[in-house]
A protein has these predicted regions:
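Fe-S-dependent hydro-lyases/dehydratases of central metabolism
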Residues: 77-725
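Short, positively charged and aromatic/hydrophobic N-terminal segments
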Residues: 15-17, 22, 33-39, 43-44, ...
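Family-specific functional microsites
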Residues: 28
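Low-acidity, Ser/Thr- and Arg-rich intrinsically disordered low-complexity segments
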Residues: 8, 22-23
Length: 725
């Protein structure tokens, strides 16, 4: 019995061994060591009987125990490899246990903002009272609101520029390029962590960074030296083999991944690309793939840092920041997808979702009205050179409008010098400035019911600025050849493809990046505030109970473009929450802002994948201003859920999705004693529909930290409390 008892103790020890061993992610071996422990226990019960002297037996058992544990420790520590994602996260871990599914806090090395989300991020940063950023590098980009049809955008840009100068942030001026393209070229470093107030920040994964899109307040906290919190993600291995066929592109790779996984298939996951096929892709091609990983709902996507990465950095005169990074050979992944690059064909994402993917042959003959080439997904030097090659000596079809936006000043300069830009112009292309432009509905809206081929990353309904526009997401190669024919055209009809190589040396000119003032001079810098700059909206601690009406009920896959539209008319209001809130949800219900404001406080009910798309925290701040106290849905998109918590809005999900049908717009909903329940760490709450008398179980899944944020009334108030301690 003694022997059996001791082996039972070993069994328990093995289940808890992860707390004794360094964070080699021992938990992954739980099946291995639990089976081993069970076998030992069973063996002890059946085979051993205590027949020897007590002391002799105890000594023998102790020796066996020591040897056994030593062997098990050595086996687990030696054999368990790490994924690339785990290596970087582990190196940056500052809070929490390195255990899958748990919340962890990581140190952030770099941040980026763009101007549509940046104004609010810097207002939030100022409110924290931290005099100078504490990151290794923070950069503010002006690339969204570049259509200055009124004073608002120009005023906001002056505000951002002055904040940057005062607080230690680099400022990329209008015209220097799209944030993700420029950051990849000039600031990205393998192995570093980056968060940005734009959902396509994972572009940095193409250079081997853990690069994550986040809300502006999360970025502000990181600039102040705070950790960024995520749930330890599942890690999906995408094993690439073979080589892309002529005229098949990196865009087709990510469209294939979207076709397989869907727009919510990546939620809670990091997509890690591995395999021999990786070597055949350049850094800009890899960045195209990681960029659109955002459309999977993934936390981020990442490629290894290898000789190809080194070649790119050398060409940018930044070889000194390179380091080789890859997963261990015996790394264990949660899922695996295998893609033979040689088997891929030209693909297109059809209206109105990036995962509505079909081959060009499946779509068939399709008359088009417009082609737009550019965006942070496909505006690199090689993308532009391919387009110029296809257009050279030809003319755009008379029925098609072709617009091209190079991704950065560097790219624009180089294609201007080598003649590629002249070839585009001669063919009939309209050249736009190096900015986001049409991708965010900032100009170039298609005609009514117009069919537009775009090399962008999103084709949500109405995002183009034309509500009934039919937007197809395609590669630059398909876009260019289709502009010539007037129909959706397979680029493989072009025949042999010439080799397009990255240059050995890019043209380096960082004169449009303004460095901050020296720390000694920062106090003399005046922050410039125009009349469009309004303070962060007031928040309040979580109420004792919530008793209010449902002001809006919406369906599945509601995007942040539905919640807080973009476009040339609305984007200039991003620093003015009272004004921009008047457009909240108007694409779904024009009366919502007035109705919600009149109710004083209310609840929104939605379907699955609520809040997918852009990282814009305005999709939480505008509802906050309109009195929204809670959002009850089937499931949330990651970034939007975090933004709701940061705004102090309670995120709730149905226990049973069928209960969605038991609540209607206008119903009165009660969450009694909700504050006490949250304080008591109760994850299962009860919503009472007073209108119908039905009780509905809901989940309120908060960690210790996010619970405190909700109780405080949002991340800004929570951070102020922490800084005051």
């Amino acid at each position: 019995m003694l022997f059996t008892a001791l082996f039972s103790l070993i069994t328990q020890l093995l289940y808890n061994i992860r707390f004794a061993v360094s964070s080699k992610d021992i938990v992954r071996n739980e099946n291995l060591y639990s089976k081993l422990a069970y076998t030992m226990q069973k063996y002890a019960l059946k085979r051993y009987k205590i027949k020897q002297m007590f002391i002799f037996t105890l000594t023998k058992i102790a020796i066996c125990y020591k040897i056994l544990i030593s062997v098990i420790f050595e086996r687990i520590v030696v054999t368990m490899g790490l994924t690339l994602t785990e290596k970087i996260l582990k190196a940056h871990l500052v809070d929490g246990e390195f255990v899958k599914g748990q919340e962890i806090g990581i140190r952030i090395d770099q941040t980026l903002t763009q101007d549509a989300t940046g104004t609010m991020a810097y207002l939030e940063y100022e409110a924290m009272g931290v005099p100078r950023v504490r990151t290794e590098k923070s950069v503010a980009y002006i690339d969204h609101n570049t259509l200055q049809s009124g004073f608002e955008n120009a005023d906001d840009h002056r505000f951002i520029g002055s904040v940057c100068k005062k607080h230690g942030i680099y400022f990329s001026r209008p015209g220097n390029g799209i944030c993700h393209q420029v950051h990849l070229e000039r600031f990205g470093i393998p192995g570093k962590t980056l968060i940005g107030s734009d959902s396509h920040t994972p572009t940095g994964g193409g250079i081997g960074m853990i690069a994550i899109g986040a809300g502006g307040l999360d970025v502000a906290v990181a600039m102040g030296g705070g950790a960024y919190y995520i749930t330890y993600p599942k890690i999906v291995k995408v094993n690439l083999t073979g080589k892309l066929s002529p005229w098949v592109s990196a865009k087709d790779v990510i469209l294939e991944v979207l076709r397989r996984m869907s727009v919510k298939g990546g939620v809670g996951k990091v997509i890690e690309y591995c395999g021999e096929g990786v070597k055949t892709l350049t850094v800009p091609e890899r960045a195209t793939i990681t960029n659109m990983g955002a459309e999977l709902g993934a936390t981020t996507s990442i490629f290894p840092s290898d000789e190809t990465t080194l070649a790119f950095l050398k060409a940018q005169d930044r070889a000194d920041v390179w380091s080789e990074l890859k997963a261990d050979d015996d790394a264990v992944y949660d899922e695996q997808i295998d893609i033979d690059l040689s088997q891929l064909v030209p693909l297109a994402a059809c209206p109105h979702s990036p995962d509505n993917v079909k081959s060009v042959n499946e779509i068939g003959k399709l008359k088009i009205d417009q082609v737009c080439i550019g965006s942070c997904t496909n505006s690199s030097y090689v993308d532009m050179m391919k387009v110029a090659h296809i257009l050279k000596g030809k003319t755009v079809d008379p029925s098609v409008s072709l617009a091209i936006a190079p991704g950065s000043k560097q790219v624009l300069n180089m294609i201007a010098e080598n003649g590629a830009l002249a070839d585009m112009i001669a063919a009939g292309a309209r050249i736009l400035e190096s900015a986001c432009g049409p991708c965010i509905g900032m100009g170039q809206s298609p005609n009514s019911k117009g069919v537009s081929l775009r090399t962008f990353n999103r084709n949500f309904e109405g995002r183009s600025g034309t509500k009934d526009g039919q937007i197809y997401l395609v590669s630059p190669e398909m876009a260019a050849v289709s502009a010539l024919t007037g129909y959706l055209t397979d680029p493989r009809t072009l025949g042999d493809m010439p080799e397009f190589k990255l240059p050995e040396h890019f043209k380096i000119n960082d004169n449009m990046v303004v460095p901050p003032a020296n720390e000694a001079d920062m106090d003399s810098v005046e922050v410039l505030r125009g009349p469009n700059i309004k303070p962060f909206p007031q928040t309040s601690p979580l109420d004792d109970s919530i008793d209010c009406q449902v002001s809006l009920k919406v369906g599945d896959n509601i995007t942040t473009d539905h919640i807080m539209p973009a476009g040339a008319k609305i984007l200039p209001l991003r620093s003015n929450i009272p004004a921009i809130s008047q457009h909240c949800f108007t694409v779904c219900d024009e009366d919502f802002p007035r109705r919600a404001k009149n109710m004083g406080k209310s609840i929104i009910v939605g379907g699955s994948n609520y809040g997918q798309g852009s990282s814009r925290e305005h999709a939480a701040l505008a509802p906050l201003y309109l009195g929204i106290k809670a959002v009850l849905v089937k499931s949330f998109a990651r970034i939007h859920r975090a933004n709701l918590i940061n705004a102090g809005i309670l995120p709730l999900t149905f226990v049973n999705e069928a209960d969605y049908d038991k609540i209607n717009q206008g119903d009165e909903i009660v969450l009694a004693d909700v504050r006490a329940d949250v304080e008591a760490d109760m994850s299962k709450l009860t919503v009472v529909n007073k209108t119908t008398g039905v009780e509905i179980p809901v989940l309120c899944e908060l960690t210790g930290r996010t619970k405190d944020i909700i109780l405080a009334g949002g991340l800004l108030d929570y951070t102020r409390e922490q800084l005051s301690k």
